[in-house]
Each structure stands twice: as C-alpha cells, then as structure tokens.
Amino acid sequence: MHVTIEQAEKAIQAARAKAVELGTQMCIAIVDSGGNLKAFHRMDGAWVGSIDIAQKKAKTAVFFGMKTGQIGALSQPGGSLYGIEHSNQGLITFPGGIPIVDADGEMSGAIGVSGSSVENDDAVALAGASAIGDTELPDHPWRT
C-alpha cells in the first residue's frame, strides 16, 4: 500500500515541527512505495539546492528499503555498493532519507529531508517518518 496524502501531510507537519525546534529551514519530500513524489514542503529560507536533494534522499530510501546513511556506509571506497550513487539518475548516500513502514511491515513510502547538517536532516526525517509508521523493514533475505 502507498502512503496516503493524509499520512504524507502528517509526516510533513511532524518533520516541519522538528525543523523549527532545531532552528533550521528544510525541504521535506514524501514519496510513495514506487518512489513517486506524493507531497513536498519547502520552508521559507530553505536552500533551492535542497529541493532536489530531499526528493533524491526519499527515492534512494524507497529504492533500497533502508536509510540513506546505511547506504552511504556501504558505498565507501572498497564497499560493496561503491559508486551506487551514480545509478538511477543519481542517488543520495548520506543521512536524511528514511523508509516509512506500515503496521503490516510493508514499506509504504519514504521521507527525504535536506537543508542543514546531515545530523539535523536525519533527525527531522525520523520525526516525520515516526509520526506515521515505523522506520525499519522486517528482515528480508535480500537485506542480510
């Protein structure tokens, strides 16, 4: 099942509240389980460059079913996914993209956030994703 527009809006509200708490301006993207943009919010003052980054973080998280920071760890020189960021018309392999997992353990979409440090981006994304679901997929053979 895909994330609904109501869920996407709730996730954006929670993410925006966390960004305000941290004193930063963010771009927040929600994609469905197919990686298609469902909702987007650009806070006043958020960088223009963060528009694309937020969307790519969300797509990366949904394409691989894991947090973008985890992909980043695997894509370092010598890593099993080295160079992966050049596939799929550009992926983002640093923190700020998180899968959204529904009550049945299925990925319904993902959130991507950009506009501050990767630590803040990740915290804001986690706040948004956690507002509507879980952030970890159950173990699958292809993820071990």
From Swiss-Prot:
It comes from the Bacteria. Induction: Up-regulated in response to formaldehyde. Expression is probably regulated by TtmR. Formaldehyde binds at K57, S114, D121. Keywords: Cytoplasm, Stress response. Heterologous expression of EfgA in Escherichia coli increases formaldehyde resistance, indicating that EfgA-mediated formaldehyde protection is transferable to non-methylotrophs. Its main location: cytoplasm. It is found in: Cytoplasm. InterPro entries: GlcG_carb_metab_protein, PduO/GlcC-like, PduO/GlcC-like_sf. This is Formaldehyde-sensing protein EfgA. Formaldehyde sensor that plays an important role in endogenous formaldehyde stress response. Directly binds formaldehyde and causes rapid growth arrest and cessation of translation in response to elevated levels of formaldehyde, a potent toxin generated by methylotrophs as an obligate central intermediate of single-carbon metabolism. Translational arrest protects cells from formaldehyde-induced protein damage. Also contributes directly or indirectly to the transcriptional formaldehyde stress response. Required for optimal transition to methylotrophy. It comes from Methylorubrum extorquens (strain PA1) (Methylobacterium extorquens). Homotetramer. Pfam families: HbpS-like. Disruption phenotype: In the absence of formaldehyde, the absence of EfgA does not impact growth or viability. In the presence of high formaldehyde concentrations, disruption of the gene allows growth when compared to wild-type strain. Mutants also exhibit increased formaldehyde resistance in the presence of other growth substrates such as succinate and methanol. However, mutants experience formaldehyde stress/damage as a result of not arresting growth. They have a delayed and muted response to formaldehyde and exhibit signs of proteotoxic and genotoxic stress. Global transcription response is also affected. PANTHER family: PROTEIN GLCG, SLR1406 PROTEIN. GO terms for cellular component: cytoplasm.
